[in-house]
Structures are given as C-alpha cells and as structure tokens.
C-alpha cells in the first residue's frame, strides 16, 4: 500500500468520524448524510479531479439540495418531483461549473424526506 493511499483513507475516516461524532452529540440536528461519504471518496482519493474541487463539493451540494427542497415544496413527494429535482440539480450544476456527482443524491433525499429549506443549511451547508 502506498502512503498516499493510506493518507486518503485515513483522511476520509477522520472527516466522517468527526461529522458523525458531532451529529451524535447534537441530537437536535443532523450533521451527516450519505452523500458526504461519496464526496470524501472524491476529495481524498481523487483530489486532482475537477469534480473534487472545494467549489464543486460545497456549491454542488447546496445547489442540488436547493433543487430538491424547491421541487418538494412546489410538487410534494411523487415520482415527477423526484425527476424534476434531479434534472434541475444536474442542469444548475452544469451551468455553474459546480458538478459534483455525490450531490446528485441530495435532491432525492430532500423530496423523499419532505425536507424544508432548513435542509439546505443543516446538514448540507
């Protein structure tokens, strides 16, 4: 095993461990969602990928979560709103050059979870 591989794995472990610990300590808020694990794979294992740029990670998650919440607020929880939310998220990430594939799960989570605008700030931001 190369030392950079170990550092990537350890960095991902440390980041997700801290987020999970904070989430465990703060029973009133969720600090971790599954797409963050996929983001850490990109950020730690493929840091030179354009999809792993900090701008893409942060804005991709915010944009995608916003698309999901807006779709849910307007259309409710149904197959059409899930499709619109994901399509809108992808479109907005592409035109803003903030594409981040793990963020594609956020609009689905937002619609299925019936999330309010708070979801955009906690846990996404």
Residue ranges and their predicted role:
Residues 76-100:
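Internal alpha-helical transmembrane segments of multi-pass membrane proteins
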Residues 66-67, 94-95, 106-108:
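Active-site beta-strand/loop microenvironment that shapes enzyme catalytic pockets
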Residues 48-56, 93-103:
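Membrane-helix interface "capping/anchor" motifs
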Residues 104-125:
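C-terminal binding/interaction regions
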Residues 1-70, 74-83, 116-123:
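Alpha-helical transmembrane segments and their membrane-interface boundaries
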Residues 39-40, 87, 106-110:
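Hydrophobic transmembrane alpha-helices of multi-pass, membrane-embedded glycosylation machinery
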């Amino acid at each position: 095993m190369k030392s950079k591989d170990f550092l990537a794995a350890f960095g991902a472990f440390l980041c997700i461990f801290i987020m999970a610990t904070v989430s465990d300590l703060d029973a009133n808020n969720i600090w971790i969602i599954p797409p963050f694990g996929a983001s850490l794979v990109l950020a730690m294992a493929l840091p030179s990928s354009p999809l792993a740029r900090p701008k893409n990670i942060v804005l991709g998650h915010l944009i995608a979560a916003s698309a999901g919440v807006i779709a849910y607020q307007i259309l409710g929880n149904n197959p059409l709103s899930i499709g619109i939310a994901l399509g809108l998220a992808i479109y907005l990430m592409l035109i803003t050059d903030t594409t981040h594939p793990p963020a594609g799960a956020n609009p689905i989570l937002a619609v299925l979870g019936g999330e309010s605008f708070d979801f955009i700030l906690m846990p996404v931001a």
